[in-house]
């Protein structure tokens, strides 16, 4: 048997399991949907019956509306059409009760609806007629109010009205309750009413004639038969006769109307009971469907569980079959592990032997044995080539070592030349830089000296202006001192005036004291004047002291300014001498700058020449280093090749052929 066939068999088994599982799941889902569909159909039938059939029938019985009856019939027909959707057993259970209800709705229910009107309408009309007759009797009594016999009518008429009211109440109770036992109350009140009618009939007439002409009299008058009409008027009868006949007729008709009303009520009750029984029969039939629906659901669930159990058993069997095939294949392939492990260790001396009847595995055995023979021959050839590579790599390593030593010496010499040229170039660049810095410094010094000349010139002018200003300030301060002396003379005059005022105030106070009470006011004024004179004298003394200090400060300022003028004049003379010396310094610095620029230009040219020589030596040294690197790499590769040759020889020796 081939491996492909085993693989196809496993695949077929797995596909079979998947297909069977899918079919089972699909069938289970469909089977589980069926009970829910049946339950939905059952609930829908129940709801439709209650809302569309039972409700319309009840409304038809209450109102007699034919539209409700037609709606109920249409709903029953719709339910009958929906029965084939149910299982046959359920449909057979529900069909008879629906058919009976549909036949009843089309026949007896229609008659019951016709009786849906008010069954006591005839009795109400008869009672209204009796009420009207009694009212006419009252009008009859009013017309004969002057006669003594009229009073005998009032008591029976009043009692007749009372019994008529009781009759209406008893009739209403009978109709509303539909209780036959209440019919005796109606008959008793009717008998009382007849009794009063008999009493009224036994009373004598009151002689009130009927003055209204009939329609035949009017017609006779129109045709010219006036004589006949007058003859008829002469034969007019008492109004009480007609009222007696009408009352007797109404009382005789009322029992017949009562009997017909009772029959109508009984028929309505019977039809309502029949309708309720048929509706209950349909509801009972629908109720019996629920256990059947649930039983159908349990049956389908049992089938689903049975089929699912079978599928699980089938899956287990297929899994066991696949496991058995895989174990057999694993045992056969396990025989390859020792031989392949020996090959991995380099031992090709043992061939592979598989004991199997599978054609593909036998082909695999032959292929692996051919591979063992090929690898053995290949390892032998590699062993021979490894010996040759080891000898060649040894020779190449010796040549590379000699070449590497020569190139190293050459690289060392070129490196020394490069370093010497670098030092020389650095020295020349330093000289050129120093000369350039000297030229720059000389230029900067010249500019600084020129700036110093300008500053000294400006300072010299400023000093001269300062001397002039200081001299002007000294003169101003001297004038201030002179003015202060003038203020002192003025203060002397003020002081003398204050002393005289004080003496005058003292004399005035003495004279006021001599005058007594009359000179008291003048004494006060004199005291104030004396106080003012004393304050003036004090203020004058303070001003005199202040002016003295001011004059002292002015004299000191004049002396200081004179000293500053002398110092400024000496400084101006020194600045003039410094300006002349700076002119000589500027000329010398200019000469130094020119010479430094020439030195810098020569150094720059020498530095450029040395730089070119150094760049050439750098390239020579770089080429030597690159050659040294390549030769070193070649030597490393030769050494690696020698090592690889040795490793290859050692590795090939590990194989056993």
Curated annotation (Swiss-Prot):
GO BP annotations, alphabetical order: chemotaxis; detection of phosphate ion; positive chemotaxis; signal transduction
Membrane spanning stretches: 6-26, 306-326
Domain HAMP: from-to ranges: 327-380
Highest rank taxon of the organism: Bacteria
Sequence ranges assigned to domain Methyl-accepting transducer in this UniProt record: 385-621
Residue ranges annotated as Cytoplasmic topological domain: 1-5, 327-657
UniProt topological domain (Periplasmic) ranges: 27-305
Entry-linked PANTHER family: METHYL-ACCEPTING CHEMOTAXIS PROTEIN CTPL (PTHR32089:SF119), METHYL-ACCEPTING CHEMOTAXIS PROTEIN MCPB (PTHR32089)
Protein's recorded name: Methyl-accepting chemotaxis protein CtpL
Source organism: Pseudomonas aeruginosa (strain ATCC 15692 / DSM 22644 / CIP 104116 / JCM 14847 / LMG 12228 / 1C / PRS 101 / PAO1)
Organism phylogeny: Bacteria, Pseudomonadati, Pseudomonadota, Gammaproteobacteria, Pseudomonadales
Recorded name of the encoding gene: ctpL
